[in-house]
Each structure stands twice: as structure tokens, then as C-alpha cells.
Amino acid sequence: MTSRVSHTSVDSRNAYTQSLFWAEVLGYSENPEDPNEPGHEECLLYSPDHQHRILFIEVPEDKAVKNRLHFDLRPTDLSQADEVARLLGLGASVHADLRRDDGGWVTMLDPEGNEFCVLCSELEVGDPLAFPAD
């Protein structure tokens, strides 16, 4: 017997603004029959295939320490550099640039200071997590 992940929860000072940012980053959407709105204490996003959900939950305290869990993003149709530029335009900031000639990543912060990483794109390295062909 096993379990499956129902959704990923993210503590937030403002669940609504975080849901707007991450919807733009990931191409996720809200439930049109139960849209996220300012003042909602919980805001839910769905992946395009509805296989993953992210729940932003308002909490009273600010983020105080480094995340123990974070998203590693692999751009699908832009280079790593172009994706970093796009995310900067959405309100993210660069925390650490760890790019190397053979790959590396950029650690960024979302508008509330949560870390996430931007890896090399699929265009640059293929899909390293793909299952090997039989």
C-alpha cells in the first residue's frame, strides 16, 4: 500500500497574491467555479493536466528560515536565462546564481521570500528525468 500526494501546501502571508504569482510562473489555473479572490485564506491552483495542485494558506507569521522543501523548475520552451528574466519581470528576485558551463541553477525568491530554483531548460539539456527507453 502507498499514498499519493494530494497537493503541495505553501504557507503565505497573502494567499491570493502568491496564487497569482505562481499561476503565472507555472501556467496553473484556479477552479473557475470557485475562483481565488483577495482576502481568501486559502487559494488553490491546478496544473494544466489537473495532476498537481498547490494550496496557498495564509498564516500570520513571516517566513523566518530557509525552506526545507522547494520547487525546482525546468523551463519547457525558453532558455534558463530567458526564464530567469521572465520570472524577474513577474516579481521574483535572484538569491544565488550557481550556473556553470555544464549546467547549474539559479536560486530565486518568490515575492514572499520562498526559495525556488531554475534549472537548465529541456531545450538545453533534454529531459534528464525521463524514463529510459525500453
Q: How would you describe each model-predicted region?
A:
Residues 17, 51, 78:
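Short alpha-helical
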Residues 39-40:
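Nucleotide-cofactor and metal-assisted catalytic machinery
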Residues 2-3, 5-13, 24, 32-33, 44-45, 61-86, 104-109, ...:
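Vicinal oxygen chelate
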Residues 13-23:
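Hydrophobic ligand-binding cavity/cleft-lining segments
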